[in-house]
Amino acid sequence: MTQLEEQLHNVETVRSITMQLEMALTKLKKDMMRGGDAKQYQVWQRESKALESAIAIIHYVAGDLK
């Protein structure tokens, strides 16, 4: 088991990481709603997908320990 997998079996660690990612995603979505040019919007979309993927991976690896 990798160190990351070991950490993700700690419920508090999973909650903390997930909360940080969700807060970043919320901020990003607020920025998207404020608007910007097409290039910036594309960057925000990629960042949003990356954050959503990270959350999904953590839940998968951690066995969804919330």
Curated annotation (Swiss-Prot):
Deletion phenotype: Deletion mutant has no detectable level of YopN secretion, YscF expression or YscEFG assembly, but it expresses normal levels of another Ysc component, YscJ/SctJ. Deletion mutant fails to secrete YopE at 37 degrees Celsius in the presence or absence of calcium.
Keywords: Cytoplasm, Plasmid, Virulence
Predominant place of localization: cytoplasm
Matching InterPro entries: T3SS_PscE/YscE
Protein function: Chaperone of the type III secretion system (T3SS), also called injectisome, which is used to inject bacterial effector proteins into eukaryotic host cells. Along with YscG, prevents premature polymerization of the YscF/SctF needle protein within the cytoplasm. Is also required for stable expression of cytosolic YscF and for YscF secretion. Likely plays a role in targeting YscF present in the cytosolic YscEFG complex to the T3SS apparatus. Required for Yop secretion.
Family: Belongs to the YscE family.
Protein name: Type 3 secretion system chaperone YscE
Species of origin: Yersinia pestis
